[in-house]
């Protein structure tokens, strides 16, 4: 495991300062787009993980973004893999990681 690659990802600089809604069809910077075009590759690679720094975003993440992006990944890959592959923080809004985990846990615990 010492050869694992940890990707440092600054959300506001590398993706958007304005996280959007749930689906691509609803506008730019959606949870669906971030999940499928940024995170999916990392989750499918056995030796990659990501640290997402959400410091500097202008508008906060909507519940629909958090659910579609992070919640659906946790549901698909399982909470243990999710927690191993992804770390999330924000220096200017420390409660944001807790908010994200609420939607992750909710998605994992919902019966299909």
How should each PLM-predicted stretch be described?
Residues 1-15:
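Short beta-strand/loop segment at the start of cytosolic alpha/beta domains
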Residues 11-50, 54-102:
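Amphipathic alpha-helical interaction surfaces in cytosolic regulatory modules
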Residues 98-112:
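Short, Lys/Arg-rich amphipathic alpha-helical interaction segments
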